[in-house]
Amino acid sequence: MSKEKFERTKPHVNVGTIGHVDHGKTTLTAAITTVLSKHFGGAARAFDQIDNAPEEKARGITINTSHVEYDTATRHYAHVDCPGHADYVKNMITGAAQMDGAILVVAATDGPMPQTREHILLGRQVGVPYIIVFLNKCDMVDDEELLELVEMEVRELLSQYDFPGDDTPIVRGSALQALNGVAEWEEKILELASHLDNYIPEPERAIDQPFLLPIEDVFSISGRGTVVTGRVERGIIRTGEEVEIVGIKETTKTTVTGVEMFRKLLDEGRAGENIGALLRGTKREEIERGQVLAKPGSITPHTDFESEVYVLSKEEGGRHTPFFKGYRPQFYFRTTDVTGTIELPEGVEMVMPGDNIKMTVSLIHPIAMDQGLRFAIREGGRTVGAGVVAKIIK
């Protein structure tokens, strides 16, 4: 096949490999880039190029992550792979690499293992919306019944964590054989690619989502009124539109009478832009940093939620000692810190630096939130943990 020209116009989708250590995540990542580059152009990446993952910092946390890119006929994919289990945990919780879908790698020779379960659970907690399964090392299993058994176990495990186990695509393959260029196993990589294209819907772009702007600063401009500034997180705001001010205090409504950027007046502000919004009839003291401007009805304020949290290790600049129930740190959402108390799961007395843990948080002020919102845990301005809202309680 002739190599297709790389089209910037293709929809962009973020995916990643998850699964138990040594089940073949990195080999599969290499195989995907190699097979797809033959068919659709792009660069093949060798195993050791991917395995040698560079260190990154996300919210002050060190994570080793490899990013590769590949194309199918209809889409462009950015794919993240992590060398170690701890890196996955950190990656999923911080949202350093947001995934529109994940490829769960399970070795047919082992079946589901403890980290298989943990990655599925994390996927549920942090809001990975779709999982596709690659049953790896199938060239080493001759027994059809055994393969069916492993498949059944994986489907049951997915269903247990509220993924549609019965409808999840499962590809039986061998990443190593595909990487080595064996045609029948290369075919399985193409099968996987077609599931990526068809099973994972195209993500909604930030600009198409309801308007939201986290407020960073508030100014009073004499003769004109109150201006709030910040970066538009999603959506578009047009002059004359009604917005809600959500979080910390009672929700109120106001109208945006002007949008400006670099001291120029505009008709609208869009996702990704730093803007000032002039608000009608709103007093300077009624608004504060930490609130958000949002499309009316699109987001609500909450104080109590379940979360999945990663606690920084001492080496990452976190705490040197464990914390216990009754711990009262600050929770940093978007632009501000709010104090909160925590509840640990049944039977857990203390949490060590470097652990990841499910905890229930109760904030002293409500914050505009929805499921999947990321936050940092801080003590006196120092980050000691990272978390994600898994479920809103009230």
Curated annotation (Swiss-Prot):
Q: Where is this region: G5?
A: 174-176
Superkingdom of the organism of origin: Bacteria
- The segments labelled G3 in the record are 81-84
User: Where does the tr-type G domain lie?
Assistant: 10-204
Q: Where is this region: G1?
A: 19-26
Which region ranges are annotated with the description G4? 136-139
> Which reaction is this enzyme known to catalyze?
GTP + H2O = GDP + phosphate + H(+)
A single MF term (Gene Ontology) = guanosine tetraphosphate binding
CDD domains assigned: EF_Tu (cd01884), EFTU_II (cd03697), EFTU_III (cd03707)
Enumerate the residues binding GTP: 19-26, 81-85, 136-139
Subcellular location as annotated: Cytoplasm
**Main localisation, per the record?**
cytoplasm
Q: Does the entry feature the keyword GTP-binding, yes or no?
A: yes
The GO cellular component terms are: cytosol
Q: What class of enzyme is it?
A: hydrolase
**Which InterPro entries does the entry mention?**
EF-Tu_GTP-bd, EF-Tu_GTPase, EFTu-like_2, EFTU_2, G_TR_CS, P-loop_NTPase, Small_GTP-bd, T_Tr_GTP-bd_dom
EC assignment: the record states 3.6.5.3
What positions does the entry give for Mg(2+) binding?
26
Name the UniProt key words of this record, in alphabetical order: Cytoplasm, Elongation factor, GTP-binding, Hydrolase, Magnesium, Metal-binding, Nucleotide-binding, Protein biosynthesis
Residue segments, region G2: 60-64
Q: Which Pfam families match?
A: GTP_EFTU, GTP_EFTU_D2, GTP_EFTU_D3
The record's similarity note reads: Belongs to the TRAFAC class translation factor GTPase superfamily. Classic translation factor GTPase family. EF-Tu/EF-1A subfamily.
According to its UniProt entry, what is the function of this protein? Answer: GTP hydrolase that promotes the GTP-dependent binding of aminoacyl-tRNA to the A-site of ribosomes during protein biosynthesis.
Listed HAMAP family:
EF_Tu_B
Task: State how it assembles.
Answer: Monomer.
What is this protein called in UniProt?
Elongation factor Tu
Q: Which organism is it from?
A: Histophilus somni (strain 2336)
